[in-house]
């Protein structure tokens, strides 16, 4: 990694703490880090570790382009905020800089309908979904079998997600999910009560690798849908079954989009 010593990295950062990990990792490799965002240092974890702090908003693409040229950035990176990822991707395209995914790949993985279609193409199982019809008279939801989970197709961070056990709850949840979707699109799925797992993959030079699988344990709900995790246990008790039945299909699926 010595070839990175002295390189200059512009990091788009907000309140998300993952950008701070990016900055610290880059600095360990001798990279000079410039962190930008219009929030105060106290609200931006990445700024606490940066070699240089800027205040250009991560929402101002023109100003970001000017800043990247001014600081002579060799590369541009961000944390896990979906908004910041999209802005970083757009900025890299403007400046002809590399980024870890393309717009096409991002549009597949960040859109629940697109991602489920990719899964189906590669015979990776997905949860059953329902379709409702909106008319001038309202929404025909007679096809639903409760409980269902309602989500914005292209939302993030758990916003706009609801579990519904009856029609009254569904109608309210449907409008709520639409309000969280940039395109006003909603996906309705069977609500599955089962073990919760998390699976991590790394993609390098077009090759996919399963890197980790954990069991996720959640606290009891306090009335909100988003339950907070109590613990992640590695490796998952389902790891062997997953490797034997699904992993190769998922690897091939990710490799199919580059």
Q: What kind of feature is each model-predicted range?
A:
Residues 1-105:
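ATP-binding N-terminal substructure of ATP-dependent carboxylate-amine bond-forming enzymes
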Residues 18, 42-43, 138, 170, ...:
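Flexible, glycine-rich phosphate/dinucleotide-binding loops
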Residues 19, 86, 158-159, 197:
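Glycine/Thr-rich phosphate-binding loops of Rossmann-like dinucleotide-binding domains
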Residues 44-48, 63-66, 107-114, 160, ...:
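Short, charged, surface-exposed secondary-structure boundary motifs
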Residues 106-187, 193, 204-205, 235-251:
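Active-site nucleotide/adenylate-binding loops and adjacent lid/helix of ATP-dependent enzymes
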Residues 190-193, 197, 201-258:
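ATP-dependent carboxylate/phosphate-activation module, predominantly the ATP-grasp catalytic core
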């Amino acid at each position: 990694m010595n070839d990175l010593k002295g390189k200059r990295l512009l990091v788009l950062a907000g309140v998300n703490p993952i950008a701070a990990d990016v900055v610290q990792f880059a600095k360990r490799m001798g990279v000079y880090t410039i962190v930008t965002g219009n929030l105060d240092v106290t609200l931006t974890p990445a700024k606490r570790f940066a070699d240089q702090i800027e205040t250009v908003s991560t929402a101002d693409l023109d100003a970001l382009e000017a800043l990247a040229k001014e600081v002579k950035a060799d590369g541009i990176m961000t944390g896990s905020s979906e908004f910041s990822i999209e802005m970083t991707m757009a900025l890299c395209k403007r400046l002809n800089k590399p980024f870890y995914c393309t717009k096409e790949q991002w549009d597949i993985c960040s859109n629940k309908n697109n991602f489920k279609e990719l899964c189906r193409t590669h015979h990776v199982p997905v949860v059953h979904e329902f379709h409702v019809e909106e008319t001038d008279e309202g929404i025909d939801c007679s096809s639903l079998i409760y409980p269902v989970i309602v989500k914005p197709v292209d939302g993030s961070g758990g916003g706009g997600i609801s579990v519904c056990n009856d029609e009254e709850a569904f109608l309210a949840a449907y409008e709520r999910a639409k309000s969280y979707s940039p395109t006003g699109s909603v996906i309705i799925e069977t609500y599955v009560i089962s073990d919760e797992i998390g699976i991590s993959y790394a993609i390098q030079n077009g090759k996919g690798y399963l890197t980790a699988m954990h069991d996720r344990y959640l606290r009891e709900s306090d009335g909100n849908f988003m339950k907070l995790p109590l613990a992640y246990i590695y490796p998952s008790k389902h790891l062997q079954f997953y490797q034997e039945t699904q992993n190769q299909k998922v690897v091939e699926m990710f490799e199919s989009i580059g």
